[in-house]
Structure formats: structure tokens, C-alpha cells
């Protein structure tokens, strides 16, 4: 009806209704009878309305735009007005500055013109003479100040030569500008990061002083003197580097020169100057300025200007001044001018004798004035001033006068230096105010500007070297360090007391300031390390050597006093050792005697451990709680001593020491570098450690270090930190409960974790307690997890940091596995220097070898490098240095299992991700050790010699046997895994498996059956995959050695895998990464980890294939964890997938676990993740195997390019299908391309885990392998055909993979997936391998 009605309506007015927009009224009326016309009308209405609105909006917009334009125009005009005013003000300012002189001159000129009109030419000349003389004096003063600042030709030119000198001054002034205004620190440098002013803190004052000095030299000498004094402070602080050397001599010369200047100008000038200097010394700048203004302002200007700069050319300028005085007297007939000339020059001499100048008014004037006063009398005091803590704050001066600083320190003329400091503080309240400030971030600036400059000029010559080093490294903590040094300077007469005090204050400061204390410690360590703070990282390696050597020397002998005088840092560190060592050496004397009884290696390792681990943990532990750690170490050590762990302690300590030596080599360099870099890494590690550890930068290491120290100490490996000996032996009186209490004291997080881990290690806690401790250990483990997670997170935070952290974690994982304390040390140390860790390790081993002659670093290094190529690599060699030194002890490697296993749970807690691969080996080792612990400590004692080897191997995640060329490829850990699987089932089972593993030729963990023979030393040559029989090291057959190495490493791997397997079994409980933490804790608990692992492993060796695959799962887990960091993901997958595929049981589970485990692996081997991420794509299998074996696969990869393909791959292959792979691959194993053939092979080997004889294998698997896998051999030989095309690794990997998938039909799918990954990896791998990626 509506339509009809509208239709009826439409005909009369249809067009208008449709076409025209309706009005509101029409719409209302039609609302009752709505029609299409109404719709059309409404539409028209709305359209019109919208158009109107849009048009209005556009109009408004135009109006607004117009307003905006007008506003902008007004704004521009307003700014133009502002600019006009600014220009006017600037013009007036400039004019005023010019007119200050010219106004008077203009007035004088007007008067002179009037006078000229009235007077004759002669009168005019007479009037002009004084003006000319004044102008000449001003010019000479300016030139002198410029020359003195620059010290170039100032001394060479006489007053007659002032014109030439002025030209020279013009040339020299820019230098003065930079002297006065030091350039900012290099962007990103430690000082740059540490100091808010970025080295330009004094710029504002210096700029004003530079401008006002030069502008106001003529204008207002008061400003000029003040600014010049500021400039002198700055220039001296800047020149201190150059001047400290010259100033030391020049100050003595100044004393002499002052004597000469005094003799020449004593009567009037020196007395006047000394009087003015005396007045000036006690007085502030205003007083000095007033005195100078009252006195001869121009003379004093000259004096101040010349004095600020003459320091360098004091004698030259004095010589120039004396003739200049005569000539100036001649030039300036007025006696006042001659007096001024004499007083400026004579006063210059006097100023130099006084050490005064406008620039030196308070800083140098006081220094030099006091020098004339005190230098004749206080010449020793001025020399003693250098010991004063603050003068040493200048880095340049410290660098220049390093030796001077130390003699001064040893001279400990702190009382005179304090006197002078007090004198300077008293004369200049502002300075004294600066005296506290110099300790601040800008100590250099403050000290430079203030008395500290005076002190610097005086003291900086000698002491600055010492404290300058420290403060150059840690200027941020200069207050603390300055105070420390003040205490030193004060207490240096009692050097040992000051050392103890410093160590206490340092411990307090470090305890109070986790990060800052660590930074301090780092800076102190840096002080030890490099003369140059920036170079501290590089020099830390060397200077740390020197410092470490003195430490090693001084620590064995009364360490605190000896190193105190040598290095400020060493003073503090030695005082750390002194107080720590005093504290702990007193306690460590007990442990030392005990540990001496244990192994002779421990003392040497102590030296390295004390040198490095003590340095690290002196920093860390002192930072954390010096006494707490001592008590914790004691209690822990007592637990171990009370337990049958004393042998383990000796071994663990040896391992920790050996590995700490190695870790110290690695880590200590890194700890030193790290300490130096911890500042640098404060950006990366600070955030990571602070964020992740929850502690300071060092909080992570502190947390982990407390846990490490507690754990490590509980594990005898702990003692090395402060008193590896002491702590491991102090324990005799302490109860496990005390350990728990001490550990809890050390750090809430680490304490619980440590207690739990220690109790777990010692079996003190039941499985439930251990599991409970596991969570608490998760706490400490969370630091390990944090380490693992940090390793992962650090991937984000700092690629190198994580890699370095990985490397650190690897080395620390290895070291922590041997001694968690080392792991934590390593974690704490390498993390900072992770980027340069490899180089540092390379150098650090040398350095630490030099530093730690006691450690078998040198013997170890030579032997290890030759024998550890695959496992040890360069760094492995370093770690293998101890391996090699423990190579002597290596025959005891079976003990290594037990020791490693005990230690590994703890270290695995910290380093689960890291340890998953290494930890797997070392877990098994560790668990085996509990078996041996249950069986008795004797194995550990017998392992004591191999404890270092175990440490190094564990730390390297390298079984010496695993280092064997074929053994390195054990990754699947087929045979050892089964034995290890038995280990996880129960400690008794483990001990049984320990026995069974040694029974197996390859089952012997570190070639245990051969003890040392099968161990890494044979394979340690980085360049040779084939083990060079180093005499006693290896079984005659490499097959047996492979088997022993594989089983030992795979036993370890299985133990680590056991952690992952426990993860796999308990994987629902925790994510892969997380549960390994529990697993390490459980591993430390052993019962819980065994319980968790027991279900899969209770079969023990029976589970060889399934357990291997199971372990392969856990390993792939480890590998998967490594995946994050590793292009090695491919490798962990290839490796994990190989092991997973090889153990078909893991077919479904391995990917997730392998990913988790791989992460752990890569975490365990940060270097691998570093280098492997780049290299692992190509090295997928090798780096992984290398990861298991080598914490430093990068170097290994480089060295292993030729040897590692055999060494690593063969080492890792032998246990898994890799024996046959080793055959095919060994044929090409020397070839870079062999790695990819090996990658598929490990998968096959997993299946045909029996040794596949590699006819071409360097490791002579021909005999054992032929018996094991002829079929896989042929298959792998077929793959070897593709292996010939190493570049086409995909062909090899595909052929090998297809074949591998056949033997691994169990996990054929997983194998195919992972092999496809391998193919991809191998596609990339061959190029890298061809280029020597491995």
C-alpha cells in the first residue's frame, strides 16, 4: 500500500520529490507514509547536507591554514627578533671583550693624543714605552703559557727569540688546546661507557678557561689565572701521560731546577715566589689570584703561564727564562718590569721550584711550590706523593709511570703523600672537595683539575701508574678504588694491612656493589692487566699474566704484600688474595697441606686457580662474601672431605685447577678480559647478568659463582676459587648443614641451589630433597638456566656475548662440570671477554702458562695442542694444557668420570644447556663418579691426576678419548650411551657401568681402561685428527681407543643425555632447557636424576641401542638447545637427529628434545655456537661433535680443518655409526668434506653403533670397526662416493642419509627429516668445510 500510495503521490510531484532534496518538514510529514520518493528525497537531503558540511569544513581548513601560516610568519619574525637580540648581545659581548682592553687604550689614546698635542714626540714615546712594555709582557706571557703548555720550543727559545717563539707558540697552541681540552673517549670504550662526561667533563671549564685564558690573558688575568690553572689541571692531567714521565724527571729536575732557579733567583724572586706560593698553597684560587694580582699580576701571569706549561720544559724554560730575565730586564728598563720579568721568569723558576704557575697556581703551583719547599725537604715526599691514591687516578700518568707507581706503592710514602694531599686539600678547599670527587667517575678530570693533579703531578708520576691503571680501568669506582688506594697509601707502610684492608673494603664494596664491585674488581684486574685501560682487554691478557705471575709468585709466597707493591689491582686482588688469601691462605694453608697431600697438581693448579680462579673469585667471591665463600668453601670442602670426596676434591680441585688453569687461561683471561670487559659487557652482560642473574653484572657470576663456589667448593673443584686447596680442605671441620647454611649465606638463590646441589652431590639430600634442591638449584640453575637461557637470551643481547658466554659456558661448563666453581668462574669470566675469548684463551694460556708455571699449562699446551686438535683445539689445547699436565695424571681418567659426574650435576645446573652435550658426557662422568663415590673415593684419588684432564675434558666437553679422532664423532654416544644409560639408572648401576664402561675398550670414559692412553692428549694436536701416540696415552688400537673414548664421552654424553633423558622422561615436568637444570641438579642429586633417568636407563648397558636413541633424544634435546645459537642447529639436528635417528626410539621425541638439548649443547659450547653458527652449517656434524668434545670448536674447527674432520668426526663417530662413517669419512676425513659424510654417518652409526671400521680412518677403526659394522661401512662407503664430492655434501649426506635412514629405520622419519636438515646443512657445510670450517 505504501508503494501504491507513494506511486499515487509520485505522479503529481514525482519528479520534484525524487529529484529535489526534501526538506526536514517534508520528511517528517512523509514519515507516516514513507515511499521510495521519500527515500530519494532523504538521500538528496543527506547528500546536500554532506556537501555543505564538506564545503564548510574546507573553508574552515583554509582559514586554519591561513592562521597557521600567519602564526608561522609571526614565529619567524619573533625568532628574527630573537636572533637580532642574540646577534646584538654577541656583538656587544665581543666588543666588550675587545673593549676591555681597548676602552682603556682608547681613553689612554685620547689622553695621549691630547698629550701628544701638548707633548713632544719624545714625551709621547715615553708615554708609549710602558704600554709597549706591558704589551710585550702580555705577549711574552701568552707565548710562555702557550709554549709551556705545549713544551715544544719554549725552552729552546730565549726572550730574544720570542718572535720565533711566538710563531712556534701559534703552532703549539692547538696542542695546548687539546691538552687543556682532552678529546672525548672513544665511543663505546669502557671509559666512554663508564663516565657520564665521556671524558669531556672538564670541557665547560676548560673551554671557558681556554677562551678566557687566551682572550683574558690581556683582559683579566684573574680569570686567566683561574682558567689557566684549570687548564693546567686539565693540561697536566692530559699531559700527565707525557708529563708523568717527564714530570717525574722534571719534578726532580724541578727540584734541581728549583735549586738552580733558587740559586739563580733565590734572593728576591724565589723568596717572593715562595712567599706567594706559600700564601697560594694554603689559599684557594681566589687567594692565589688575589695574591698574584696584588703581587706582579703580569709577572705572576707570566709565571703562572710559564709554570703551567714549563713543567715539561722546566729546565729549558728556566734556562730561557734566566737569559730572558736578563734580556727582559734590558728590554724593559723599568725596574718593575724587570722585577716582573725576573719574577715571571725568576718566579717561573721559582714557580717551578715552587711548582707554581697560573696554571699550577694550586695544582702545579702547589705541587711545585711544595716541591721547592717540600721537595728539597720533601723531595722524597713528592716522590712519595705518587703513592697517594688519587694521583694514581690518571690513567695516562699511571701508564707512563707504572713502575714508578709501584715503587711508590711499595715505597708506600703514603704518609707524606697524604700530607701533601692534605696540604693540597687544605690550601684548596675546592681542591679538597675535588679530592673526594676525583674518586668519582671523573677522577681523572677532577684530579686533573684539582689537587689530584697536583698530587698527580707529584704523585701521579709514581703512584698514578698504579692507581691510574686501576682507575683508568675503573674510573667509575675511582671513589672506591681511590679510597682503597688512600687506604693503601695510608696503610701501604703496612702493605699487608692495607691489602687486607683493601681486600676487606673491596669485599665490602664488592658485596655492597655487586656490579660496581665487580666492576671495581674488574677495573682492578684491569689495572693489573693493562697499563692502558682501553687496552686492558688485550693487555689484560698480558698484564694479567704479569699480574697473575706476580700473583702466582706472590700468592705462593706471602701473596698480599708482594703483589700489593707491584700492582694496585694486584694490591687489591692480592689483598683479595691477601685478605682473601690471608683469610683463605690461613685457611688454605690447611687445605693446601691437605691438598698437597692430595695431589701435587693442586698446588700448581692452586697457583693457576688462585692466579685465575682466585683472581676471578677473589673478585667475585670477595665481592660476594669473602668470608662466606671461605666458610662455604670450607664447609663444602668439609662435606667433600668428610665425604669420600677428598680424593674427588683433589681431583675436582685439580680439575678445577687444571681446568681453572685452563678456564683461567680461558676464563681468567676472560675473567681479566672479562673483568675488563665486564665493564664493556655491562652493556651486554650487565643487562643480561643483571636482568637474568638478578645479581649485578657480576651478579650472574656471583650468583653462579656463589653457587659455583658453593657447588664447586662442595665439589672439591670449588676450592680453587679462593682457597681451592683451602676450601676443599677446610671442609674437614664443617658439616653438610654448614655447607647448606654457608651456601645459603653466600646467596639466597645460589645458597639454596648450592646446598641442594652440594647435598645432592654428596648424596646428603634424598632424591626428594635433591629435587627440592633442584628447584633451588633451578634458582642457581636458573643462573645456569640463565646462563643457558642467557646464552640464548644473550644471543639477543650480545651475539658475541652469548657466544662468548657459550664459550664461557662451554669452558665454564667444562670447568664447572669438572668444578662448577670454574664453570661459574668461566661463566663469569669468559662472558665479559667472550668476543675475544678465543684469542684471549690462546694468549691467556700462554699468558697463564707464564703466569702459572706451576700449572702444567706449558707442558700441557705443547702436548695438548699436538694431541687435542679435535677435542682441545687451540683452546681445548689450553684446557688440555691441564689435560696434558694431567695427561700425566690422565691414566686416572676413570676417576674423572666420577669427579666429573659429581661436579657436572652442579656445573650442569649452571650449564645445563651448555652441559647437555658436554654435560651429557660429564653427567655420565659425574654420575659415574657418584658410582665411584659410592664405590669409593679411591677412584677419584686415582683420578686426581686425571681430574685436570677430566676437568679439561669435561670443560671442553671433550673426553680425551672423545678427542681421539674417531671418538670425537661419538655424538650419538651409542655404546657409551648404553653404558651411560645404565649409569643414570642408579649410582650403583653407574658404578657398575663405570666398571662396564672401562671394561669396554671404547666404553672406558677417557680411555679409562688405558687411563691416559685413550685420553684426549693423544688427539689433542689441534691439526691432526689422528692421535699421535704420545707415549703412554693411548691404547695400541685406535678402535679400542675410539670405543673407550666414545663410550667414555658417550657415557658422559649419556649422562648429559641422561639429564636430557631425564628431561625426556621428565620432559612433561620441565621444558627441555628447564628440566636439564633440574637434571643437573638431579644429576648433582644423582638420585633424582638417576631416578628420572632410571626408567629409561635401568636397562643399563642393555639399553645400548634404545638408550642410545633415548640418549640421542636427550642429546638432540641438547642439540636443539644449541639450535638457537647454532647454525649448528643443523648440526645438533644432524648430530641430534643422527643420534635420534640412530636410536630410532627417539624418532618422535628427538626434535623437541634435540632442539632443547641442542640449545644446551650450543650453550655448553658457546664457541661452537659462535663459530658453529657460522661454521656449523657446514660443520654440522663435526662442530656438533666438536661441541660435545670441544668448548672451543672454532679453533678446533680451524685446526681441525684437516685433523678435526678425523679427530672430531672420528672421535664422535666411532661410538655411533660414525665408525663406519669414519671409514668412509675417514677416507676423506682429512678432507674438509668428510665432515658431511660424517654427519649422515653418525646417524647410521647410531644404528650400527657397533664400531664401523673406517679402513681409511686415522684412528685405526679398521680392526674394531670391521668387526662392528661391515654393512654400514659399505653403505657409508657408498656415501663416501658422494663424499668425494665434498662440495656436494648434499649428495653425500643424501646418500649417506638415505643409507643412514635405512639402518635407522627405527627413526627413519626423524632421520630423514634431520638428514634433510643435514643435507641442507651439508650443502652449506661443504663450502665451509672446504674452506676449513672444521
Swiss-Prot record:
Pfam family name, one: CAP-ZIP_m
Renumbered residue ranges of the record's region Required for interaction with F-actin-capping protein subunit alpha (CAPZA1 or CAPZA2 or CAPZA3): 1024-1042
Keyword Amino-acid biosynthesis: no
GO biological process: endosomal transport; protein localization to endosome; protein transport; regulation of Arp2/3 complex-mediated actin nucleation; retrograde transport, endosome to Golgi
UniProt cross-references to InterPro entries, sorted A to Z: FAM21/CAPZIP (IPR029341)
Motif range (LFa 17): 1323-1331
Keywords assigned: Cell membrane, Endosome, Membrane, Phosphoprotein, Protein transport, Transport
Domain of life: Eukaryota
Motif (LFa 14): 1227-1233
LFa 5 (motif): residue ranges: 566-577
Region named Sufficient for interaction with CCDC93: 347-594
Residues with the Phosphoserine modification: 157, 159, 204-205, 209, 284, 388, 533, 538, 613-614, 723, 747, 752, 783, 798, 870, 873, 1049, 1067, 1084, 1109, 1169, 1172-1173, 1333
Compositionally biased region (Low complexity): 201-213, 541-561, 1297-1311
Motif LFa 3 per UniProt: ranges: 476-485
Subunit-level organization: Component of the WASH core complex also described as WASH regulatory complex (SHRC) composed of WASHC1, WASHC2, WASHC3, WASHC4 and WASHC5; in the complex interacts (via N-terminus) directly with WASHC1. The WASH core complex associates with the F-actin-capping protein dimer (formed by CAPZA1, CAPZA2 or CAPZA3 and CAPZB) in a transient or substoichiometric manner which was initially described as WASH complex. Interacts with VPS35; mediates the association with the retromer CSC complex. Interacts with FKBP15.
Record function comment: Acts as a component of the WASH core complex that functions as a nucleation-promoting factor (NPF) at the surface of endosomes, where it recruits and activates the Arp2/3 complex to induce actin polymerization, playing a key role in the fission of tubules that serve as transport intermediates during endosome sorting. Mediates the recruitment of the WASH core complex to endosome membranes via binding to phospholipids and VPS35 of the retromer CSC.
Domain observations: The LFa (leucine-phenylalanine-acidic) motif bind directly to VPS35 of retromer CSC; adjacent motifs can act cooperatively to bind multiple CSCs, although there is significant variability in the affinities of different motifs for retromer.
Protein name: WASH complex subunit 2
Protein's organism: Mus musculus (Mouse)
Upper lineage: Eukaryota, Metazoa, Chordata, Craniata, Vertebrata
Amino acid at each position: 500500500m505504501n508503494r501504491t500510495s507513494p506511486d499515487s503521490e509520485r505522479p503529481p510531484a514525482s519528479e520534484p520529490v525524487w529529484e529535489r532534496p526534501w526538506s526536514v518538514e517534508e520528511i517528517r510529514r512523509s514519515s507516516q507514509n514513507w515511499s521510495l520518493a521519500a527515500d530519494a528525497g532523504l538521500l538528496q537531503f543527506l547528500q546536500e547536507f554532506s556537501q555543505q558540511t564538506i564545503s564548510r569544513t574546507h573553508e574552515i581548513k583554509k582559514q586554519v591554514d591561513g592562521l597557521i601560516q600567519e602564526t608561522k610568519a609571526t614565529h619567524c619574525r619573533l625568532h628574527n627578533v630573537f636572533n637580532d637580540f642574540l646577534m646584538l648581545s654577541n656583538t656587544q659581548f665581543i666588543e666588550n671583550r675587545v673593549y676591555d682592553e681597548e676602552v682603556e687604550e682608547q681613553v689612554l689614546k685620547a689622553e695621549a693624543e691630547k698629550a701628544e698635542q701638548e707633548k713632544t714626540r719624545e714625551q709621547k714615546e715615553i708615554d708609549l714605552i710602558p704600554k709597549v712594555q706591558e704589551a710585550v709582557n702580555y705577549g711574552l706571557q701568552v707565548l710562555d703559557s702557550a709554549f709551556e703548555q705545549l713544551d715544544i720550543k719554549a725552552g729552546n727559545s730565549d726572550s730574544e727569540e720570542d718572535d720565533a717563539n711566538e710563531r712556534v707558540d701559534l703552532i703549539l697552541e692547538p696542542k695546548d688546546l687539546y691538552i687543556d681540552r682532552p678529546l672525548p673517549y672513544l665511543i663505546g670504550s669502557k671509559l666512554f661507557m663508564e663516565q657520564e662526561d665521556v671524558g669531556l667533563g672538564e670541557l665547560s671549564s676548560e673551554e671557558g678557561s681556554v677562551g678566557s685564558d687566551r682572550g683574558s690573558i690581556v683582559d683579566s688575568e684573574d680569570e686567566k689565572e683561574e682558567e689557566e690553572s684549570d687548564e693546567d689541571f686539565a693540561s697536566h692531567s692530559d699531559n700527565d701521560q707525557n708529563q708523568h714521565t717527564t714530570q717525574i724527571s722534571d719534578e726532580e729536575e724541578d727540584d734541581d731546577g728549583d735549586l738552580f732557579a733558587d740559586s739563580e733567583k733565590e734572593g728576591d724572586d724565589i723568596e717572593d715566589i715562595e712567599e706567594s706560593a706559600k700564601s697560594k698553597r694554603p689559599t684557594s684560587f681566589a687567594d692565589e689570584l688575589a695574591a698574584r694580582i696584588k703581587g706582579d699580576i703580569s709577572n705572576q701571569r707570566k709565571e703562572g703561564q710559564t709554570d703551567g706549561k714549563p713543567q715539561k720544559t722546566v729546565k729549558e724554560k728556566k734556562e730561557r727564562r734566566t737569559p730572558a730575565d736578563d734580556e727582559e730586564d734590558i728590554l724593559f728598563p723599568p725596574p718593575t718590569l724587570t722585577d716582573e720579568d725576573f719574577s715571571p721568569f725568576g718566579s717561573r723558576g721559582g714557580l717551578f721550584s715552587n711548582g707554581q704557575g697560573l696554571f699550577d697556581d694550586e695544582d702545579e703551583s702547589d705541587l711545585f711550590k711544595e716541591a721547592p719547599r717540600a721537595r728539597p725537604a720533601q723531595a722524597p715526599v713528592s716522590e712519595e706523593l705518587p703513592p697517594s691514591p688519587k694521583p694514581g687516578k690518571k690513567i695516562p700518568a699511571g701508564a707512563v709511570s707504572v713502575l714508578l707507581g709501584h715503587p711508590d706503592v711499595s715505597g708506600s710514602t703514603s704518609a707524606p703523600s697524604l700530607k701533601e694531599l692534605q696540604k693540597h686539600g687544605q690550601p684548596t678547599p675546592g681542591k679538597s672537595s675535588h679530592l673526594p670527587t676525583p674518586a668519582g667517575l671523573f677522577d681523572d678530570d677532577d684530579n686533573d683539575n684539582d689537587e689530584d693533579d697536583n698530587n698527580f703531578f707529584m704523585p701521579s708520576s709514581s703512584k698514578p701508574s698504579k692507581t691510574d691503571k686501576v682507575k683508568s680501568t675503573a674510573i667509575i669506582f675511582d671513589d672506591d678504588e681511590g679510597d682503597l688506594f688512600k687506604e693503601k697509601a695510608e696503610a701501604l707502610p703496612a702493605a699487608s694491612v692495607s691489602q687486607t684492608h683493601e681486600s676487606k673494603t673491596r669485599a665490602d664494596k664488592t658485596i655492597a656493589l655487586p656490579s660496581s664491585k665487580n666492576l671495581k674488581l674488574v677495573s682492578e684486574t684491569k689495572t693489573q692487566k693493562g697499563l692502558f685501560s682501553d687496552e686492558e682487554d688485550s693487555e689484560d691478557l698480558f698484564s694479567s699474566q704479569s699480574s697473575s705471575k706476580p700473583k702466582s709468585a706472590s700468592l705462593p709466597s706471602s701473596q698480599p704484600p708482594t703483589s700489593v707493591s707491584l700492582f694496585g689491582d694486584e694490591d687489591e686482588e692480592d689483598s683479595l688474595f691477601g685478605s682473601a688469601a690471608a683469610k683463605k691462605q690461613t685457611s688454605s694453608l690447611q687445605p693446601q697441606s691437605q691438598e698437597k697431600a692430595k695431589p701435587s697438581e693442586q698446588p700448581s693448579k692452586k697457583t693457576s686457580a688462585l692466579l685465575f680462579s682466585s683472581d676471578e673469585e677473589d673478585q667475585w667471591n670477595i665481592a660476594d662474601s669473602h668470608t662466606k665463600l671461605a666458610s662455604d668453601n670450607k664447609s663444602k670442602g668439609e662435606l667433600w672431605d668428610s665425604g669420600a670426596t677428598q680424593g674427588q676434591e683433589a681431583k675436582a680441585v685439580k680439575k678445577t685447577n687444571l681446568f681453572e688453569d685452563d678456564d683461567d687461561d680461558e676464563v681468567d683471561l676472560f675473567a681479566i678480559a672479562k673483568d675488563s670487559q665486564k665493564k664493556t659487557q655491562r652493556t651486554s652482560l650487565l643487562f643480561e647478568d643483571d636482568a637474568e642473574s638478578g645479581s649485578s653484572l657480576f651478579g650472574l657470576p656471583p650468583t653462579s659463582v656463589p653457587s659455583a663456589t658453593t657447588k664447586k667448593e662442595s665439589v672439591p673443584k670449588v676450592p680453587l676459587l679462593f682457597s681451592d686447596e683451602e676450601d676443599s680442605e677446610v671442609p674437614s671441620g664443617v658439616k653438610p648443614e654448614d655447607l647448606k647454611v654457608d651456601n645459603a649465606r653466600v646467596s639466597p638463590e645460589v645458597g639454596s641451589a648450592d646446598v641442594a646441589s652440594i647435598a645432592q652431590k654428596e648424596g646428603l639430600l634424598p632424591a626428594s630433597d635433591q629435587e627440592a634442591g633442584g628447584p633451588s638449584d633451578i634458582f642457581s640453575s636458573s643462573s645456569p638456566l640463565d646462563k643457558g637461557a642467557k646464552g640464548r637470551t644473550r644471543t639477543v643481547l650480545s651475539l658475541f656475548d652469548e657466544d662468548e658466554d657459550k664459550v664461557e659456558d662451554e669452558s665454564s661448563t667444562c670447568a664447572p662440570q669438572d668444578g662448577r666453581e670454574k664453570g661459574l668462574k668461566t661463566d663469569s669470566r669468559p662472558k665479559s671477554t667472550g668476543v675475544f675469548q678465543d684469542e684471549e684463551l690462546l694468549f691467556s694460556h700462554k699468558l697463564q702458562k707464564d703466569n702459572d708455571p706451576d700449572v702444567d699449562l706449558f707442558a700441557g699446551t705443547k702436548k695438548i695442542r699436538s694431541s687435542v686438535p679435535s677435542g682441545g683445539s687451540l683452546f681445548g689445547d689450553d684446557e688440555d694444557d691441564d689435560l696434558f699436565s694431567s695427561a700425566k695424571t690422565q691414566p686416572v681418567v676413570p676417576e674423572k668420570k666420577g669427579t666429573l659426574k659429581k661436579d657436572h650435576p652442579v656445573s650442569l645446573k649452571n650449564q645445563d644447556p651448555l652441559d647437555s652435550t658436554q654435560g651429557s658426557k660429564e653427567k655420565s662422568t659425574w654420575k659415574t663418579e657418584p658410582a665411584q663415590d659410592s664405590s669409593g673415593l679411591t677412584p677419584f684419588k686415582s683420578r686426581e691426576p686425571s681430574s685436570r684432564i677430566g676437568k679439561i675434558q669435561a670443560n671442553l666437553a671433550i673426553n680425551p678419548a672423545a678427542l681421539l679422532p674417531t671418538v670425537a664423532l661419538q655424538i650419538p654416544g651409542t655404546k657409551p650411551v648404553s653404558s651411560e644409560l645404565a649409569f643414570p639408572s642408579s649410582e650403583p648401576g653407574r658404578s657398575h657401568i663405570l666398571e662396564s664402561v672401562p671394561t669396554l675398550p671404547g666404553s672406558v670414559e677417557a680411555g679409562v681402561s688405558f687411563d691416559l692412553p685413550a685420553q684426549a692428549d693423544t688427539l689433542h694436536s689441534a691439526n691432526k685428527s689422528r692421535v699421535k701416540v704420545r707415549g703412554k696415552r693411548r691404547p695400541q688400537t685406535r678402535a679400542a681407543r675410539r670405543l673407550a673414548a666414545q663410550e667414555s664421552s658417550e657415557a658422559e654424553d649419556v649422562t648429559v643425555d641422561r639429564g636430557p633423558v631425564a628431561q625426556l622422561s621428565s620432559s612433561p615436568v620441565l621444558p627441555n632447557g628447564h628440566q636439564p637444570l633440574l637434571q643437573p641438579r638431579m644429576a648433582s642429586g644423582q638420585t633424582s636424576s638417576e631416578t628420572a633417568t632410571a626408567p629409561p636407563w635401568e636397562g643399563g648397558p642393555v639399553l645400548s641401542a634404545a638408550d642410545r636413541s633415548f640418549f640421542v633424544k636427550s642429546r638432540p634435546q641438547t642439540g636443539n638447545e644449541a639450535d638457537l645459537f647454532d647454525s649448528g642447529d643443523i648440526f645438533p639436528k644432524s648430530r641430534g637427529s643422527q643420534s635420534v635417528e640412530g636410536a630410532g626410539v627417539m624418532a618422535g621425541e628427538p626434535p623437541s628434545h634435540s632442539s632443547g638439548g641442542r640449545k644446551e649443547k650450543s650453550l655448553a659450547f658457546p664457541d661452537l655456537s659462535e663459530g658453529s653458527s657460522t661454521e656449523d652449517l657446514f660443520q654440522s656434524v663435526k662442530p656438533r661433535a666438536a661441541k660435545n668434545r670441544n668448548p672451543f670448536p672454532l679453533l678446533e674447527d680451524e685446526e681441525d680443518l684437516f685433523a678435526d674432520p678425523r679427530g672430531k668426526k672420528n672421535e664422535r663417530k666411532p661410538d655411533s655409526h660414525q665408525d663406519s662413517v669414519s671409514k668412509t669419512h675417514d677416507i676423506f676425513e682429512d678432507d674438509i668434506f668428510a665432515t658431511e659424510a660424517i654427519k649422515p654417518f653418525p646417524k647410521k652409526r647410531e644404528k650400527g653403533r657397533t664400531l664401523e671400521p673406517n679402513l681409511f680412518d686415522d684412528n685405526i677403526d679398521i680392526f674394531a670397526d670391521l668387526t662392528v659394522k661391515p654393512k654400514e661401512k659399505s653403505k657409508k662407503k657408498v656415501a663416501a662416493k658422494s663424499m668425494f664430492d665434498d662440495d656436494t655434501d648434499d649428495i653425500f649426506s643424501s646418500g649417506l642419509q638415505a643409507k643412514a635412514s635405512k639402518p635407522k629405520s627405527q627413526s627413519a622419519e626423524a632421520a630423514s627429516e634431520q638428514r634433510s636438515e643435514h643435507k641442507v646443512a651439508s650443502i652449506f657445510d661443504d663450502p665451509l668445510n672446504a674452506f676449513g670450517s672444521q
